[in-house]
């Protein structure tokens, strides 16, 4: 059943049922699903017309939800990654880190052709609540078909996707740009 809701509990229930959800993030609207549900993930790819090789970001509500993905990092780098997530104010640009990952940690469809996984711990209140209600991290990729600008409102997201998914209505965060992406192993900025 397709729905529009302001209830985080209803939105999390949709994710648990293998459905796709559009929701506001720090800077743009995102599309999300249970990262371990391949059918839901492939629906996102079809909606976006995105190749599976690109991979997607995982969004967590707190460090505890992705702690096991930090295990292979050097302790100094690990501390830097965690600090970047936990000390950022709500109006600062979000940071997504590329972390080394093995295929037994996350499904290969999440990483695409890469040997790293893109992870962000959010401080956007609605996204934090959604991840907590879902009881884990979720897929987060911008709500737009390939080649078009990401949606910045419910109206734009629904214009792109219509009745093809569920919508959690709420406010965008205060950031004006999508997250910065940094390779945790090399320190290289992938997207500034």
Swiss-Prot record:
A molecular function GO annotation: double-stranded RNA binding
Keyword Lyase: no
Subcellular location(s) per record: Cytoplasm
Top-rank taxon: Bacteria
Keyword flag Nucleotide-binding: yes
GO cellular component: cytoplasm
Ranges where the YrdC-like domain occurs: 5-192
Primary site of residence: cytoplasm
InterPro entries: DHBP_synth_RibB-like_a/b_dom (IPR017945), Sua5-like_dom (IPR006070), TC-AMP_synthase (IPR023535), TC-AMP_synthase_SUA5 (IPR050156)
EC number: 2.7.7.87
Pfam family, any one: Sua5_yciO_yrdC
Reaction(s) this enzyme catalyzes, per UniProt: L-threonine + hydrogencarbonate + ATP = L-threonylcarbamoyladenylate + diphosphate + H2O
Keywords for the protein's UniProt record, in alphabetical order: ATP-binding, Cytoplasm, Nucleotide-binding, Nucleotidyltransferase, Transferase, tRNA processing
Any GO BP: regulation of translational fidelity
Stated family: Belongs to the SUA5 family. TsaC subfamily.
Record's function text: Required for the formation of a threonylcarbamoyl group on adenosine at position 37 (t(6)A37) in tRNAs that read codons beginning with adenine. Catalyzes the conversion of L-threonine, HCO(3)(-)/CO(2) and ATP to give threonylcarbamoyl-AMP (TC-AMP) as the acyladenylate intermediate, with the release of diphosphate.
PANTHER family linked to this entry: SUA5, THREONYLCARBAMOYL-AMP SYNTHASE
HAMAP family in alphabetical order: TsaC
Name recorded for this polypeptide: Threonylcarbamoyl-AMP synthase
